[in-house]
């Protein structure tokens, strides 16, 4: 729209160029879609323009028309929508990968876990087989005591040992209580120790250590034999060259008896064979009488080994009484 100026020249409408274009162009044509890269370039351009001087920014905002503003807003909305779609797409992809990993049979169970399960299964199978085999051997005569072997016998009859053991032939070896059998065999007076072992497939072995007589003592019912521990284990004829014991209360708990037996065990074999009688009225007064009548004054039971060595040397000298009660000063009379 034009008018006439004061001098007759056409006057310019105060409206800006954009307004004139809006009036002459008519309705705005549809704008082609702008992709995200164009939006980012627009944002970059606008950011660069905004970093200019304050005056230029104010001028740009003052002369921005409706069409440019609408275009810029549409570009911003498209960029925001594209970013939202990209985020949603990333979320869907992550979820899909997680589900695929969970359903993947090669990743569902770690290899170490599979190996551990196999070991556990084999261990359980072996345990079951072991239990089944144990039950089979325990309740069936596959491995039974068909033979009973006794070793270490000298004076004890084997029948006496088998009777005391009381193991029925054909008893499964696993059902034989070896400790109980050993305790029954040890009740025999002449048995010092007894040991029972299973020897598969069908043998029960009994090992015995018999008591050995060291001294003998006369009783009204006959001679009683005593071993090195002072145990009265047999009644009967005394072996030759076995010394007689003179003690008030012989037994394993009598100190005088134990002292006399310690002296006999300390003597050299050739000297012990010469002893005919050992008297121990007390621990402090021990006397030996040799077969030929010589007397040995032993005294107390201390320093027994020294006294035994001194006596072996003194007996080579003539005399009737040998005093080793003081091993530092032995005498011969």
From Swiss-Prot:
The keyword Transmembrane helix applies. Pfam families: FtsQ_DivIB_C, POTRA_1. The keyword DNA damage does not apply. The chain crosses the membrane at residues 119-139. Residues 143-211 form the POTRA domain. One of its GO terms (cellular component) is plasma membrane. Residues 1-99 are annotated as: Disordered. GO terms for biological process: cell septum assembly; FtsZ-dependent cytokinesis. PANTHER family: CELL DIVISION PROTEIN DIVIB (PTHR37820), CELL DIVISION PROTEIN FTSQ (PTHR37820:SF1). HAMAP family: FtsQ_subfam. This is Cell division protein FtsQ. It comes from Mycolicibacterium smegmatis (strain ATCC 700084 / mc(2)155).
